[in-house]
Amino acid sequence: MNAAEIVMPALGPALPELILTVGALVLILYGALRGERSTEGVTVGAIIVLIVALFSVVSQPLGAKITTFNGSFIVDGFARVMKTLTLVGSLAALLLARDLFARERIERFEYPILIVLSSIGMLIMASANDLIGLYLGLELQSLAAYVIASFHRDDVRSTEAGLKYFVLGALSSGMLLYGASLVYGFTGSVSFPGIVTALREAHAGLGLVLGIVFVAAGVAFKLAAVPFHMWTPDVYEGAPTPVTAFFASAPKMAAMAMTVRVFIGAFPGVVAEWQQIIVFIAIASMALGSFAAIGQRNLKRLMAYSSIGNVGYALIGLAAGTEEGVRGVVVYMAIYLAMTLGAFAVILGMRRGNRMFETIEDLSGLSRTHPWLAFCLAMMMFSLAGIPPLAGFFAKFYVFAAAIKAGLNVLAVIGVVTSVVGAYYYVRIVKIMYFDDAQAAYEPLAPGLRIVLAASSVVVVLFWIVPAPLVAAAGTAARSLF
């Protein structure tokens, strides 16, 4: 057996990552040769690369499980579903940014390349089967994200957002690494199957529990979950709106995939030890997300607290520690992706001339100037509030049902109560759009915004008619972890 026979089979399962890597390198060369004139070409090229990578993920058999790179990289049903959601989020983020950057003459070809590079890290996070691979994917995603956050370098708010994100991100990476070192020290392995085997043969000591706590702290930062959420409102508000839309979508999918993979894949035998940590994070995130958003006037800041609360609801499914719980997490994240992208498509459409608007009051009377836009945003808000028969209701139903089945009745009740509280600020937005005095009309939506908003609206409004495909895919993803 020659070297080619050894290496080439190992590359097959990582085909989506390879496509993105080669595509990013080609786009960098093209951009460097053409300069700022290449911005449109690089953007279109990045969209094509993401579509090809998405096709390569979708075309893989959903039920198969393959490991490669000495077991550090796994491709199973869970990885495929979460990679699909991640790439959809990245694609939508590029579509949302394309028209705005062209209008504001932000002619920098690096942005779409950074999205592609960040996507490589996110796909690795979803397929990581050991702590080292997980950290490498996480850092690749984060390094690109730090630059993206401060991409509008002439804007003080954008620069401040990038700096805050970088400093706190470096702190969280250190905590994750320290936790990983403790886990390795007390189990003798960094691979998830090796950790599982070690925990079968020995009791989980205090050192291992401490390691799990630090790992949980590291992943909680990437999820923007309480108490490691402090960067989220400022970064969401300060970053350019297309960047905020990206942060609220694709990285959330990858971070949740990483979190589920770590706790279900590496620590299934010590559920009692980490379940309490996840329950605390879920309750704190739901409570803060619901109450802190009530007084917000800036839509991007409100969406930041909304994302914190939604992460808390998704973590209810993980806290259950069961197959039904993981299925609920996958369904929740898929629907959350649609709701968030739809909401940001409307926010990006709030434009008159060269001025962008992003406060809640700027939505006054939107139903009279842009009835279709108001209807779509109202559906997103009602869905985020969990009002039936919209998709958001079913997302919460699946995670609450999993929690009750696992005996976490108090957690489910707290989830319902915080949902009722959170409904206030979602319904307030609808009230402002339909009952307040109208302002001057905004400009027509750009084509990219229309595509994202239409697709999101279809998912949110019509999910109850055909829920089977998503639920079945989520079920297959969950079974691959158990």
Swiss-Prot record:
Protein name, entry field: NADH-quinone oxidoreductase subunit N
Entry keyword set: Cell inner membrane, Cell membrane, Membrane, NAD, Quinone, Translocase, Transmembrane, Transmembrane helix, Transport, Ubiquinone
Primary role: NDH-1 shuttles electrons from NADH, via FMN and iron-sulfur (Fe-S) centers, to quinones in the respiratory chain. The immediate electron acceptor for the enzyme in this species is believed to be ubiquinone. Couples the redox reaction to proton translocation (for every two electrons transferred, four hydrogen ions are translocated across the cytoplasmic membrane), and thus conserves the redox energy in a proton gradient.
EC number(s) on file: 7.1.1.-
Subunit structure, as described in the record: NDH-1 is composed of 14 different subunits. Subunits NuoA, H, J, K, L, M, N constitute the membrane sector of the complex.
GO cellular-component term (any): plasma membrane
GO MF entries: NADH dehydrogenase (ubiquinone) activity; NADH:ubiquinone reductase (non-electrogenic) activity; quinone binding
GO biological process, one term: ATP synthesis coupled electron transport
Family: Belongs to the complex I subunit 2 family.
Source species: Methylobacterium nodulans (strain LMG 21967 / CNCM I-2342 / ORS 2060)
Reactions that this protein is recorded to catalyse: a quinone + NADH + 5 H(+)(in) = a quinol + NAD(+) + 4 H(+)(out)
Broad class of where this protein is predominantly found: membrane
Membrane-topology annotation of the record: Multi-pass membrane protein
Segments crossing the lipid bilayer: 10-30, 44-64, 77-97, 113-133, 166-186, 206-226, 243-265, 277-296, 302-322, 328-348, 374-394, 397-417, 451-471
Cellular compartments annotated: Cell inner membrane
Main enzyme class: translocase
InterPro entries: NADH-Q_OxRdtase_suN/2 (IPR010096), ND/Mrp_TM (IPR001750)
